[in-house]
Swiss-Prot record:
Protein name in the entry: Serpin-Z2A
CDD domains registered for this protein in UniProt: serpinP_plants
Site (Reactive bond): L357, S358
SMART domains, per the entry: SERPIN
UniProt cross-references to Pfam families, sorted A to Z: Serpin
PANTHER family to which the protein is assigned, alphabetical: SERINE PROTEASE INHIBITOR, SERPIN (PTHR11461), SERPIN-Z1C (PTHR11461:SF317)
PROSITE patterns in alphabetical order: SERPIN
Keyword field: Protease inhibitor, Serine protease inhibitor
Source organism (scientific name): Triticum aestivum
Domain remark text: The reactive center loop (RCL) extends out from the body of the protein and directs binding to the target protease. The protease cleaves the serpin at the reactive site within the RCL, establishing a covalent linkage between the carboxyl group of the serpin reactive site and the serine hydroxyl of the protease. The resulting inactive serpin-protease complex is highly stable.
The organism's taxonomic lineage, starting at the top: Eukaryota, Viridiplantae, Streptophyta, Embryophyta, Tracheophyta
Length: 398
């Protein structure tokens, strides 16, 4: 496993982060999403779309590259190679987080993959390429893909492909799955966990389990925003994973914060806490999120239209005798995140189917996450964001 990221990849990671925050803002503009807890994996989606870029040509490739934040496809592939081999590598160090990531390409037996696409998919994306029979065994292939995702995510993501989503007209399925489990460096004492009030966006309140601590915490506070950093045990791993809780001071400030991060993704870096501080009071709710979405409309909203249209050019992917070629019909994405006293367990899967400078906080500060907030899980040495989400009601799914 590589231990450092190439310097020229860091700008690409910043573009990937911007893509993630743009998606988060788009999701938060959906009334159904704003009423529920949400989690998704920007790196999972970004890698899946980058792999599609490897098989795209002409204007379709250009639009994918622009939406994903790069000037050329080669930079996307270089980023994916670094992220897959460094950030998402499966390490087995004692006490370090467990990270498992897998890419898959399932292609109908009637359409051989182009050697150039297959080589790039295997070498840079570490993707498994499997020949399957969509035309007569669509249900069996659906079960095969679902079983593959369920295995990678240790059972947390089930049925990534809904029944009937693959038919005899399907020719290609690309997807990936990501699993993360980490223990806090400083775990919370479950004996002091107790219920307290959490205030919802409609002004009402609920009682939900909160974790408490009297220990010093990594906190920054400025511009109406408090950011909590909860590091995961590192063990012998050179990577450093952390969860960040982004808590707006305004009880209903979560959506304006999401918009601001979309417009200014560097805001996160400016607010990363650099030091531990003593707190008068600290409490954070436990939460568990299971969220699934068909993401093609979200991606179209970001300007990614061509891969889903009849004008799609995916000619670099397969040797296709069909004059109309291929197009992406849907992008299924599912995520699971659980936060409790010992740490975090999280998983995500994406399937694409084809027909700040931190201000010094005052010593009398507190951190009380008793109203809706954003969160993310990040690998700090690279800046790659694995998961983004929001919590509007922590009692749901607990």
């Amino acid at each position: 496993m590589a231990t450092t990221l190439a310097t020229d990849v860091r700008l690409s990671i910043a573009h990937q982060t911007r893509f993630g925050f743009r998606l988060a803002s788009t999701i938060s503009s959906n009334p159904e999403s704003t009423a529920n807890n949400v989690a998704f994996s920007p790196v999972s989606l970004h890698v899946a779309l980058s792999l599609i870029t490897a098989g795209a040509g002409g204007a379709t490739r250009d639009q994918l590259v622009a939406t994903l934040g790069e000037g050329e496809a080669e930079r996307l592939h270089a980023l994916a190679e670094q992220v897959v081999q460094f950030v998402l590598a499966d390490a087995s160090y004692a006490d370090s987080p467990r990270v498992t990531f897998a890419n898959g390409v399932f292609v109908d037996a009637s359409l051989p993959l182009k050697p150039s696409f297959q080589e790039l998919a295997v070498c840079k994306y570490k993707a498994e390429a499997q020949s399957v029979d969509f035309q007569t065994k669509a249900a069996e292939v659906t079960a095969q893909v679902n079983s593959w995702v369920e295995k990678v995510t240790t059972g947390l993501i089930k049925d990534i492909l809904p029944a009937g989503s693959i038919s005899n007209t399907t020719r290609l399925v690309l997807g990936n799955a990501l699993y993360f489990k980490g223990a806090w460096t400083d775990q919370f004492d479950s004996r002091v966990t107790k219920s307290d009030y959490f205030y919802l966006l409609d002004g009402s309140s609920i009682q939900t389990p909160f974790m408490y601590s009297s220990e010093e915490q990594y906190i920054s506070s400025s511009d109406g925003l408090k950011v909590l950093k909860l590091p995961y045990k590192q063990g012998g791993d050179k990577r450093q994973f952390s969860m960040y809780i982004l808590l707006p001071e305004a009880p209903s400030g979560i959506w304006s914060l999401a918009e601001k991060l979309s417009a200014e993704p560097e805001l996160l870096e400016r607010h990363i806490p650099r030091q531990k501080v003593a707190l008068r009071q600290f409490k954070l709710p436990k939460f568990k999120i299971s969220f699934g979405i068909e993401a093609s409309d979200l991606l179209k909203h970001l300007g990614l239209q061509l891969p889903f249209s009849d004008e799609a050019d995916l000619s670099e992917m397969v040797d296709s005798p069909m004059p109309q070629g291929l197009r992406i019909s849907s992008v299924f994405h599912k995520t699971f995140v659980e936060v409790n006293e010992t740490g975090t367990e999280a998983a995500a899967a994406t399937i694409a189917k084809a027909v700040l400078l931190s201000a010094s906080p005052p010593s009398d500060m507190d951190f009380i996450a008793d109203h809706p907030f954003l969160f993310l899980i990040r690998e700090d040495t690279s800046g790659v964001v694995l998961f983004i989400g929001h919590v509007v009601n922590p009692l749901r799914s607990l």
